[in-house]
């Protein structure tokens, strides 16, 4: 209902920063797959200082947990000056970005207490999936089976996470002593796992104060592999999809 009265954009620019930018990158894959919509993720602090080319039928989606991120707010204002429709995806109700946007979708995740965004980031990803499903259906490109399966998977997600957390904590406790002395980490991902690799590296930096870099798996051979040594941990995010064999190849 938040975007139901707005036209379907010919191109969507997702403008965000940090965790929100990674959520936007992840959403790009879903929008391209389900809605066949051209999507350009933009880092807010870069977007606002470029001589950006925006068309009147472009739409801008700005993502911010706080709704007060200065660079994202400035990018929103720039887009509106150029005549673009602007949608805000925010968590804090009544903050500056939602007030200035043409439409707003609230994640309603509650106050974000931790330094590293957790529930806000997860909520943004869920909303991005719903947006992709909505536009895919509205454009008549998404079959009912895919939509129903995706919605059922989203409904089952809380239970899946709850069931998986004990084993994940146990694994983390087992691995942490092995890698506690490491000075750098790589996080690798391909396709829609790449934004999550970037997010994993950011989380390690924010929480543990350890240097980490996220890379697209295929980019390893173009320089970063030169840094790999026996005591350089690498985490590979490899989903069980068509890219799985390829990810294993680069990981090995």
Task: Give short role names for the model-derived ranges.
Residues 1-13, 93, 103-235, 243:
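Active-site phosphate/pyrophosphate-binding segments
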Residues 2-19, 25, 39-40:
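Pre-Walker A segment
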Residues 20-26, 68-75, 97, 193-198, ...:
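Short glycine/serine/threonine-rich phosphate/pyrophosphate-binding segments
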Residues 28, 32-63, 211-227:
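Glycine-rich oxoanion-binding loops at beta->alpha junctions
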Residues 35, 56, 82, 99-101, ...:
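Short, structured coil segments at secondary-structure junctions
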Residues 49-50, 88-100, 222-223:
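Short, glycine/polar-rich helix-capping loops at beta-to-alpha or helix-loop-helix junctions
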Residues 59-66, 230-240:
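A structural-propensity feature for long, helix-poor, extended segments
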Residues 250-251:
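Conserved small/polar residues in nucleotide/adenosyl-binding loops
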């Amino acid at each position: 209902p938040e975007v139901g009265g707005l036209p379907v954009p010919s191109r969507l620019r997702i403008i965000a920063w940090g965790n929100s930018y990674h959520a936007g990158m992840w959403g790009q894959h879903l929008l391209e797959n389900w809605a066949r919509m051209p999507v350009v993720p933009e880092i807010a602090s870069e977007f606002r200082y470029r001589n950006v080319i925006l068309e009147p039928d472009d739409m801008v989606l700005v993502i911010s947990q706080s709704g007060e991120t200065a660079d994202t707010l400035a990018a929103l204002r720039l887009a509106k000056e150029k005549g673009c429709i602007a949608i805000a995806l925010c968590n804090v109700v009544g903050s500056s970005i939602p007030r200035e946007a043409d439409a707003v979708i609230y994640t309603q995740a509650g106050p974000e207490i931790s330094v590293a965004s957790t529930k806000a980031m997860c909520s943004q990803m869920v909303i991005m999936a719903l947006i992709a499903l909505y536009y895919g259906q509205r454009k008549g490109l998404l079959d009912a089976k895919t939509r129903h399966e995706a919605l059922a998977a989203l409904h089952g997600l809380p239970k899946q996470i709850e069931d998986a957390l004990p084993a994940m904590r146990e694994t983390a406790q087992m691995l942490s002593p092995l890698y506690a002395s490491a000075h750098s980490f790589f996080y690798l991902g391909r396709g829609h796992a790449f934004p999550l690799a970037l997010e994993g590296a950011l989380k390690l930096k924010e929480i543990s104060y350890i240097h980490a870099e996220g890379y697209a798996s295929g980019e390893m051979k173009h320089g970063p592999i030169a840094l790999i040594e026996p005591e350089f941990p690498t985490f590979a995010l490899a989903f069980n999809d068509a890219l799985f064999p390829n990810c294993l190849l680069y990981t090995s």
